[in-house]
Every structure is written in C-alpha cells, then in structure tokens.
Amino acid sequence: MSSTRIPVAIIGSGNIGTDLMIKILRCSDTLEVGAMVGIDPASDGLARAERLGVPTTAGGIDGLLALPNFKEIRIAFDATSAGAHKVHDSKLRAHGVRIIDLTPAAVGPYVVPVVNFAEHAHEPNLNMVTCGGQATIPIVHAVAGVAPVHYAEIVAAISSKSAGPGTRANIDEFTETTSRAIVEVGGAARGKAIIVLNPAEPPLIMRDTVYCFVPLDADTQAIVDAVEQRVAEVNRYVPGYRLKQHVQFEHFTENNRQNIPGLGWSTGIKVAVYLEVEGAGHYLPAYAGNLDIMTSAALTVAERIAQAQFTDQGL
C-alpha cells in the first residue's frame, strides 16, 4: 500500500468501472486502485486491470473479500446493479469499507458533489443519483438558491450507443430516482425527469435541458449569475460540462398563465438552461458524457472522503 494514496476497490468491470479505474490511475493523487472486481473472467475491464498491474478477481464480492490485500481497501465503488448492491453493501459495511454507489439502489443518501457532499461526508454509503441528476440537479439547486422553484423538469438526451443494457433496463429507476433527487437535493417543490435515447449517427454528446418555474418577481440576473457560477463549479471536476447557450426566461402573467404539473394554471417565470456534457475520453468515447459525469462525480466524492477521513488519520 502506498503511504500517500488510499486503496479503493471497483466492483463492476464494465464501462463505468473500467473508466473509473483509468481515471484513478491517470488523474488521482489521493487514490490507488487496490482491486478490480467482476463476474466475467473474459471481460475487457478485468483484462485491462491485469495488464495495468491491478489486483483482480472474477469472483464478485466474495472474491474481493478473499483477496490478500482486501484489509487495506478503504473505499469501494459499486458499478453493478441495484439488486447486487444491497448484498455488496451489507458485506462491505461489516468490514468498515465506505461505499460509493453508482447504481439505482439508493441505500444511502443522494449526493451531488457541488451541492450536498459536506452534509453526508461521513455516511457509510453514498448514492450518486443518476447521470441526468449529476448534470441537472446542480442547476436546480443554484436557481433555488435565488428564488423558490415551484416545479423543475429535466430532460436528459443521451446517445443510444452510450446506453448499455444496465441503463436500458433501469429507465424507470432513472426517472424515479432523478425526480426524487430534484426535490430532495435540488430544492424544487416538485420535480420530473425524462430521459431520451438518441439513435443519431455519428453519436451526439449528452445534452441536458433544465426547466425551473419561479415567481414573477424573481431576480433574473441573480439567477443567471448563480447558474453560471454553478456551471463553473461542476466544470472543475467534469471539464466537458458547459452551458450550450445563454440562460433563457419566459414570463407568464395573468394574461398567459402556464399549466404547471401539480400546480395548474399559474403565473411565473420559466427558466430554461441548456447544457452539454462531453466525456473526457479516458476509456469511454467523448460522446458518452452521461457515463463520464457519473465516474467524475464519484471520483470527486471518493477523493474528498479520502482527504477528510483517511489521510487525516494517517491510514
């Protein structure tokens, strides 16, 4: 074990797990990959890990527990499935391993690094919401810091090629989880999430649209400033995250009320924020910004945990 880096395990040797491994190996001064865990001995992720000198096992969670260096593992990323995660959580907690959950299981609290990491820094299990949540909840939260958000709706459009079998099987979980997090983390009174799989060729990078409905007397310039500042904050750990165009406003008065879900015909201002997320291309293609923002956010959370908890303890 390195004297300056905290060993982590990555459970799930698919696209997300492999991208996480490459990110840590190339970019992290705080973490080292202590194990890559899969269930398919022929997976590309396990093969790459072996070539890079990372300890591997195709024995799943029990294979991880049996590795000679398991006792050194402090943090585990779970990039498998919601069902498997519940089993992994119980076994890892018994050994005091902190867990960063990239599945829809949501055993622990939702975490978006720029919004609420500090509130949950010492929780044993942190859930990374969804790719759409990581891209859009920071914006909802920024707007909510300026004016009450009566309703927020997000549309995440991703390339079909970046949506693997896990994503396709969990569409309902994506919308439900993201909708809840828009309210619980973003601060909106009501929330709705929509995901669109775009089959266009060549594949398009991730696009996200955020709509927030706020009171007519909201300070629109303050909203613009808050959104631009928040985009810059997310961009620090997701370099491909950016505004696609200027923040837009549409006013609805007594003469042209807008029908808002759960509210009915209402007066207010519709705030529209258009984003795009380009992947860093560490392992995944650049158009897979939806996957890249998840791995980048998870890496950021793990590094903050390592710096705050383990480095200070000299572990």
Curated annotation (Swiss-Prot):
Q: Which residues form the active site?
A: 131 (acyl-thioester intermediate)
The EC designation for this entry is 1.2.1.10
For this UniProt record, give its keywords in alphabetical order, as a comma-separated list: Aromatic hydrocarbons catabolism, NAD, Oxidoreductase
Pfam family of this protein, just one? Semialdhyde_dh
State if NAD is listed as a keyword: yes
Q: So what does this thing catalyse? A: acetaldehyde + NAD(+) + CoA = acetyl-CoA + NADH + H(+)
What are the binding positions for NAD(+) in this chain?
13-16, 162-170, 290
Highest taxon of the lineage: Bacteria
An example GO BP is: catabolic process
Molecular function, one GO term: NAD binding
Similarity section: Belongs to the acetaldehyde dehydrogenase family.
Instruction: Name the HAMAP family for this protein.
Output: Ac_ald_DH_ac (MF_01657)
Protein name from the UniProt record: Acetaldehyde dehydrogenase 2
Please name the source species. Pseudomonas putida (strain W619)
